[in-house]
Each structure stands twice: as C-alpha cells, then as structure tokens.
Amino acid sequence: MPGQGIVVSRSSGGLVTALEPVMRACFGTWVAHGTGTADKAVVDCRDGVRVPPATPTYRLRRVWLNGPEERGYYSGFANEGLWALCHDAGVKPVFRPNDFETYATVNARFSEAVVEEVEGDSPLVLVQDYHFALAPLYVRKRLPQSTIVAFWHIPWPRRRKLMACPWWRELLYGLLASSIVGFQTTDDCVNFLDSVEALPRCRVDRTQNVVTHDGYRTVVRAYPVSLEWPNRLVSESLPVGACREAVRRELGLEPGIRLGIGVDRLDYTKGIVHKLLAIERLLEDHPDLRGRCVFVQIAEPSRTGLAAYRDVRMSVLNACARINARFGTGTYRPIVLRERHHEPAEVYRFLRGADLCYVGSLHDGMNLVAKEFVSSRDDERGVLVLSRFAGAAQELRGALTVNPYKIEESASRLAEALQMPEQEQADRMRSMRTVVAEFNAFWWAGRMIEDAANSRQAGRSTNTIPFAGSSRRRLNFRVGESAGHDVTCTAGTAAVARERSRLHDPIDRAARGAFRLRSPVWPCRTP
C-alpha cells in the first residue's frame, strides 16, 4: 500500500472466520492461493510464511496461479458454474469445458502441495469447500492410507439441478474419495445422498448416512460451521456503549437515532436489494421512523470481473439512490452504503453499536454474520432479523425469521425489531448466545476430527486405517478456499483449552485420545 509498506488485510468471508481461530489453536499449516500484491514478497524459499505477523502461531503455504488459471478455475468453473448451481438465487450457472479442465489442473496442484507438506503416509486431511471437489480423489491417489474429511460450506443442490453440470459425476466421485463428507445442514446431506444414488455401483445406507462404492466407505454428516468463543474481537473492542457513540459520531448521527446494520459481500445470493426494498416499505408504513432510523449496509466488493456481480452492484446503487432521494433530506439519509473492505474490528464496532442486524440471504449455507452479531452482543441487547433461507436460521431460534422475498413481511419484522422491549431482546439474545458459545468453531472442527479418529480407530472404512497405528498424525484442512496446516497436537491441546469456554469439548477429546496432530495441512483458496 503506497506510503504504508506491507499491510496485512484479513478476509471477512465465512470460511476464514471459522478456520482462522482453529488454525491459531492448532499451530498448523494452511495451504492457500496467494492473491495479495505483497504475498510473494513475504514468503520463504518454500513459499511459506508464519502468521499472524505479530504473534505467529501457524504457517501459511502459498500456491501460485497465473491469470488464465485464476479465471478458469476460480471465476469460471467455481463461481460462474458451481456457486450459481448450488444457490437458488435466480442466476443460471455457466459451464465451459476449458474452465473445468483448469479447475481439475488447479485441484491437482493444490493436492500436490498437500502431499509435499505432510509427513508420513497416513495423514488426516481436511479439504474445504467447492473450490476443491476433485482434490480428495487426487490426494487419495497419492496418499491411499490417508483419512480425508471434505467440508462443503455452501448448499448442495437437488439431484436434478446438479445434473445440469456436465461433470456432475466427476464432482461426486471426487468427493466420495473422502472418508467423511460434511455439510452445513441435514437438508444438504439428503440432497447429496440423493445425488449419489444416481451413480452406478454406489450403495446408500440412509439409516447410517453411509455410501459404499468401489470398495470404499464414505460417511456423510452435518457439521454446522461457527465462530471462536470467547470471541477475541469482542474482547479487544470498546464497550457496547462506546461503540454506539463511535459509529453514530462517525456517521454524523444524533445519539437517539435507531441504527440497523447489514454486512454482506456484494453477491446476488445475499438479497441486498430485497433488504433495501423492505426498508423502503418500512419507511412507507411507518412515517414516524423517517429521520429517526438509519440503515448501514456494509457491502464488500466481490468477484467484480463477473457480469452477475456487476449487475447486482448497480441494482444496489440504484436502490440506495432512489430510497435516499425519496425519504432523505439535506441532513438525513435513511440508507448509508459503505462499499469497501472493512477489517473485522471495524465490522464488530458496527455490530456492537447497532440496534438490529438484518441478514436477508436468498440462499446461504450458513451465514456467519448472523452468529457474529450474536457473538458481538455481550450486553444481551439488539435484535437479529434473519432469512429463513440461511442455514443459521436452523440454530438461532431467537431471531425474527423472514422470507426475504416477502417484502411486506420483512418490513413488518423490522418494525417489530425496532419496537421490541429490552427484556425480550435479552431473552432472545441470551438463548442465541448459548447456542453460539456451545457449538463454536472449535466444536465444529473437533467433531470432524473426532469422527475421523473414530473412523480410523474402528477401521470401519476400507479407505482409512486406525489412527492408533501411528503416534504422528497429519491434519490437512481444506482444499478450496484456504490452505493447509502442520499441527502438533500435544501443544495444540493446551492452546485449544486456553481458548475454549467449555472444558470437555470434541477437539480436546480428539487431541487427547486418538490424535497427536503433527503438521496438518489445510488446502484452501485464499485466507
């Protein structure tokens, strides 16, 4: 950055939000695509760097892609193809043979990086997200004794829709090379098993959620992703009252102004335009709120090279301009659009300073912003308005749920949120905070690790071996959006215990029992 030297910028995406605290606790190696302008300047001779810079706790291994590879693998097949295929948001997927070939090539390259990072021939490999559907098969071919856990962070489509992809069989066979395939919800698991039943020589046991195929056995489970708890960003932030004052001062608002917040990537799945229409209806139906209520939409620029994303950006800009022109005055704007990257500390300041948070996803695997809002409110105040089409709605029962396509319903829920008594706010927030605290990121990772350990110990799968056979384990976390890690679990256990709010959680049991996690590798796209 001009005049500032090298600056560390952390992604606000859900995958990084979930994985980064686990990496800090496990002291691992994260294999990731390097996209920052200074990434090559900071790596060592093995394309690695220790992070975070101030207090390094894990290693980041970079994989480099050129422009055509980035366009074909990431922008093309992964996002124009798979992202659109897996989300019901009105955008048709685009599939090109050249994009799939590049996707396969890049998956093979990340898999090779995993093989280079691991020690021994029986690692535990955790592969993350839709960017790496083929990687489990490539890793299996190179490390046949490995235990592979693939986690798919976004929704899995229904079988008929999946078959629109010309390479749907290759995707399924790639994932079925895993010992365990994880999803956000049980609905996703059902859709995946329905899809697998279309493959020859695959037998699905619905009672156990197990697929048997070509001598292999793959377990299919739901592991709802979550946040670290206690939340480091909350402990490092100002008190809630100070955050309220700070954000209103920054926005030039009077202290009594009611404030709503939305935090999204500029993505067509996030329902930002529908959200703005609901706010417009709210101001129509409640004239008394004009001048007394402001909604801040943090909109992270995303995939700007794709037409669908440019279109949604223009729709958001036009809606904001129209609503502000209709209800605004010389000193008042009902909508404040902040179209830029915000560091996590900035986001949490707004979450802690707002009266309500509106998550209006049209289709979302989980949506961690909803959980971040809950995590941020240690004052047990604030109201979460949450789309029923986000996976988080299945866990956060204290939220006011909406169908974002029903504008009138959404406006009514927003009015209810603004009028909710403090005691009801506290009751709802307390119940949601209990869920997020108990089922946190360490619980999420720990369950996957524990299930993998149990699979190996029991020898239940012909494509895994019992963990007890070796004292040195390797954890490969995530081929897709982030990278791999090397973890030593004797040290990792103590670190995890320090960061957890509960004592006997799955990651601790896994570490104490079946694992001594040594140098895990987590392949991902970019942290």
What kind of region is each of these model predictions?
Residues 1-473:
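Catalytic cores of carbohydrate-active enzymes across secretory and cytosolic contexts
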Residues 5-9, 509-514:
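Short, N-terminal intrinsically disordered low-complexity segments that are rich in Pro/Gly
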Residues 159, 394, 505-507, 512:
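Conserved protein kinase catalytic core
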Residues 461-463, 487, 525:
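Intrinsically disordered/low-complexity terminal segments and short unstructured peptides
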Residues 478-486:
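Short, basic/aromatic recognition patches
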Residues 487-510:
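Asp-based phosphoryl-transfer active-site loop
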Residues 510-526:
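Short, acidic loop-to-helix structural element flanking the phosphoryl-transfer center
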